[in-house]
Amino acid sequence: MQTVIKNGTVYQNGRLIHADVLIEDQKIKAIGTDLTGDKVIDATGKLVSPGLVDVHVHYRDPGQTYKEDIETGSKAAAHGGFTTVGAMPNVTPVPDTPDLMKKMVQENKQKGIVHIFQYGPITKNETTDELPDYAALKKAGAFALSNDGHGVQTAQTMYLAMQEAKKNDLIVAAHAQDDSLFNHGIVNEGEKAKELNLPPVTELAETTQIARDLLLAEKTGVHYHICHVSTKTSVELVRIAKACGINVTCEAAPHHLLLTEDDIPKDNGYYKMNPPLRSKEDQVALLVGLLDGTIDLIATDHAPHAKQEKQGGMQNAAFGITGSETAFSTLYTKFVKEDKVFTLEQLLSWLSDQPAKVFGLKKAGVLEPGCPADVAIFDLEHETELKEKNYQSKGINTPFTGQKIYGATVMTMVDGEVVYQRGEK
């Protein structure tokens, strides 16, 4: 059967064009005008995009499925227009052996409704200095390495990890955090920490480890990717490193682009995340970094928690914010429609073809004949409200609930099959 998406504004090759998209046998067959098919999806007035790509999600499965599981996490991704995600390995047990990795990959495929690529850990159990067998993990299905949630604390361990990752052509995606400097902090070091009387987090906890790792990456030649950069100095370090030819890429999270520490209204656990919300100066630096190419992509760091884990104030709340279901719409509304900081084409690139390119996910994040029919359709014209009852994730831990947005997802397709349709829970 042939399905045609008619009369949409299609994002293809960095441009927006008025076109139809023809789908057959799970693939894009053609993009053009006056195309016909057995089934017609009317996209008049809608944006037709490649399925978005999020290289940073936490599905808590196995081990903490009361927070999220593969099924609900992938449904949340589809609700946000994402058709490809990278799942972090901070689950229980950590997939640090070939058997555990194979099982994880199999579970992702069986339970997920989007394409789920699985990270392996940089170190065994994510908390030791012992390296797993990277070659075996890659053969079992790992597409990259990360200890996200934990910084690799010793330079020697990271140096050895980068050497082995380079040998096996694996990306090292680092959560840059020096625990001795983080020192059980909660909010960014500044006036807000003083106002709330909460332990501060110095930016040095992030920047010193980035500086260390950039030197190690230069020495080893590994592809070093930095998760959720959040400070002006971090951006400057990456900018200098790229100018020096170091093989480094990095991502920014939607919440660090949209919010600052000044937006924390009170001691509210929904605003507790790691890295913490930073200063206005840091926020501006992130936006400039995206626009000048220092920051390569946007990734959500979707980190769901049970409702009770985010209540009772920031001191005892868990770190983390959801993002899969709110990323595109909140970013589009704020930075494209309202403030005109960047274009729709730029936003779509940072959320689709760029993450796919950086991580070597061939045929993801693009609409081209012969590629998988992974498609997202968005409504840019009508205002809607973000409501808890509409979330597909088990986690409702986002401060964006109640916000009026444009860019709601109308439909998401994976391999030509509809996996999300607005109005259907």
UniProtKB/Swiss-Prot annotation:
Active site location: 301
Keyword set includes Iron: no
InterPro entries: Amidohydro-rel, DHOase, DHOase/Allantoinase_Hydrolase, Dihydroorotase_CS, Metal-dep_hydrolase_composite, Metal_Hydrolase
One Gene Ontology term of the molecular function aspect: allantoinase activity
Gene Ontology CC annotations of this record: cytoplasm
Enzyme class: hydrolase
Pathway: Pyrimidine metabolism; UMP biosynthesis via de novo pathway; (S)-dihydroorotate from bicarbonate: step 3/3
Cofactor: Zn(2+)
Positions bound to substrate: 58-60, 90, 274, 305, 319-320
A Pfam family matched in the record: Amidohydro_1
Binding-site residues for Zn(2+) 2, renumbered to this chain: 148, 175, 228
Residues the record lists as binding Zn(2+) 1: 56, 58, 148, 301
Co-factor remark: Binds 2 Zn(2+) ions per subunit.
A GO biological process held by the record: purine nucleobase catabolic process
Function according to Swiss-Prot or TrEMBL: Catalyzes the reversible cyclization of carbamoyl aspartate to dihydroorotate.
Protein name as it appears in the record: Dihydroorotase
